[in-house]
Amino acid sequence: MTSESTSPPVVPPLHSPKSPVWPTFPFHRESSRIWERGGGVSPRDLPSPLPTKRTRTYSATARASAGPVFKGVCKQFSRSQGHGFITPENGSEDIFVHVSDIEGEYVPVEGDEVTYKMCPIPPKNQKFQAVEVVLTQLAPHTPHETWSGQVVGS
């Protein structure tokens, strides 16, 4: 009778890389075409971190959903960066909009009429962002792209 050891095989421990691995993007936010066009939008106008539908609290979502519906016009929107701004119908300060808050099948372009509700941007809750954004009238004579990439119109 032999006494053989039935210990598990030795597995080397996992090691993480010596330097962190960061995703690379084909552009930098500050040097993207959105900033080169002008229009008064600067990196300091963007909330940081960008608030999304996914990171918003349930209570903030419920308050926004219960709030009034506003009208405005899309000032600009960058699909690649996932955000843009809406100019309110009443002429007040432009409102930030995140891609996760746009409903419907079309990517907004400058001049599209929209309806939206408003939600405060944490942590100070001094500025607002547009949520539940619906395109009500597409800008005439402007090609529009669907989220799947199909271009519609001329």
Curated annotation (Swiss-Prot):
One of its GO terms (cellular component) is nucleus. One of its GO terms (biological process) is mRNA processing. Its main location: nucleus. Brain-specific. Expression restricted to the pyramidal neurons of the cerebral cortex and in the Purkinje cells of the cerebellum. Residues 69-136 form the CSD domain. Residues 1-22, 36-62 are annotated as: Disordered. Keywords: Cytoplasm, mRNA processing, Nucleus, Phosphoprotein, RNA-binding. It is found in: Nucleus; Cytoplasm. GO terms for molecular function: mRNA 3'-UTR binding; RNA binding. InterPro entries: Ca-reg_mRNA-binding_domain, CSD, CSD_CS, CSP_DNA-bd, NA-bd_OB-fold. Coiled coil: none annotated. It comes from the Eukaryota. The modification Phosphoserine is found at residue 19. Signal peptide: none annotated. It holds the Pfam family CSD. RNA-binding factor which binds specifically to the very 3'-UTR ends of both histone H1 and H3.3 mRNAs, encompassing the polyadenylation signal. Might play a central role in the negative regulation of histone variant synthesis in the developing brain. This is Cold shock domain-containing protein C2. It comes from Rattus norvegicus (Rat). The gene is Csdc2.
